[in-house]
Amino acid sequence: MRKLIIPLFVLLLPLSSEASVARRASLPDLVKASSTVVVGTVTQRSSFWSGTRIYTRNQITVEEIWLQGTTVDPQKLTLPPTSPALEVHTLGGVVGDIGQSVSGSPRLVTGHTYVLFLTEGAPNQWHVVALSQGAFEASSEALRPLTQTHALELVGDATAIPTTRTKLRQAIIAWVKEQP
């Protein structure tokens, strides 16, 4: 028996290094950590070096803004006219023939539409909140969390996050309106 367990452990050891572990974020966690929540399509991607890390710059054409600060009123949610698109930086990418992959970081795809929970870094430079937990692929009405495909192991209580665009938006609005 012992002879069988040791080889199995050795075989499984490399698999454990392929994932990031993070505390599971609830919808209130995502909303509280976000400066804005948008629905947008990736129109362009390019990777670049910053120190010893590679980042990917994702140009997002915003279709809808669901949250801006603490505002959920659709008539008050606007992007500045000088920047109709957002620049979202994600960890990892390929520059020349060198690539870096960061487990748990969202990998956005050109032409795909996402619901993104974002926080602003430098002016007009945004980052997805809570690794890939803050990104949902949106095909028409259905949402798919990117945590399912981006090697992110979540720990903590599972909280139900709505799986459609309409229900997620309604849940965000309801939560924000409940706050003092």
Identify the meaning behind each predicted range.
Residues 1-4:
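Positively charged n-region of N-terminal signal peptides that target proteins for export
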Residues 6-14:
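Bacterial N-terminal signal peptides
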Residues 20-34, 49:
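Short boundary/loop segments of OB/S1/cold-shock single-stranded nucleic-acid-binding domains
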Residues 48-61:
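Short aromatic-glycine-enriched beta-strand elements
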Residues 72, 97-180:
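Netrin-like (NTR/C345C) domain of secreted extracellular proteins
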